[in-house]
Amino acid sequence: MISAFCPGHVTCFFQPITSLDPLSAGSRGAGIRLSLGTTVKVNPVPGNAMVTKVNDGTGSDDIIRKVVRSIDPSGGYEINVRHDLPVGQGFGMSAADAVAVAICMCQITGRSKTEAYRIAHVADLLGGGGRGDVAGIMANCQQPVRTVAGIPPFGKVEDFRVNVGRVTLAVLGSPLETKDVLSEREKYVDIRNAGSDAMQEYLERPSLESLFKISNRFSAEAGVRSRETDAAIEALEEKGFMAAMCMLGNSIFTNAPVSEARSVIGDVWAVSCNAVPEEAGIIRTR
């Protein structure tokens, strides 16, 4: 049995980029790597069946299966996945799943970690998950900025040494499907244009304050905020905190402590975590 942990990743703003080569596709954008994420256990078993269990057994395993079969088309495996954060709320759980499973599978089959990231990126992208979370996770810095779309070395991720520290994540509504949002042509164009402007502005003056400010301008111009998200951001800002929407979810990230965030926006699901540079990797082998 092999176990791996992968950090989650919040995208703050993004510019979707398409390409015939999935390794060069994804998005430009800025994000935050999280101390909470996904823990995966992979156990090779006789035969060719794949049995997966995600959290309480109700989670989707489509991207996990894509990763496994990209590496071993016919082997038998038992796979257990545990999420620290909700799925479909912009916390990068599908990407973290893909990376953690790919690292385990590549360890089992003697492949490199670089190959694991490439496989995870393609599976997450084609499976309708994140558009750049895997590249952000691969960067090993608190606040990765994806200046060129795709997975390195095709894409490029830079570290501008922005210290994020501790953040609170709060969920305000039902999950969103990234693929559903981006499938609307008009919405896609709005997001792409807003993302291009956001990237240009952020690269001129990267800082924690501008990360929140530009994230809010992006979500407003792209038209992706729900009423609940909009109200929560406004309420926290009125109390002197910074807050912005997680892409793409009915959720926010803020510098307000959990207790103070809840006192402002209500008794919602919320958790505090750190922005971290530590890489994803194997945590146990047997």
Report the location of each language-model feature:
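DPxDG-like acidic metal-binding loop motif
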Residues: 91-115
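Solvent-exposed alpha-helices and their adjacent loops that cap or buttress functional pockets
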Residues: 4-6, 22-23, 31-34, 127-129, ...
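Short, hydrophobic/aliphatic alpha-helical segments
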Residues: 74-84, 118-125, 228-239
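Short beta-strand scaffold segments in enzyme catalytic cores
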Residues: 10-16, 38-43, 133-138, 142-145, ...
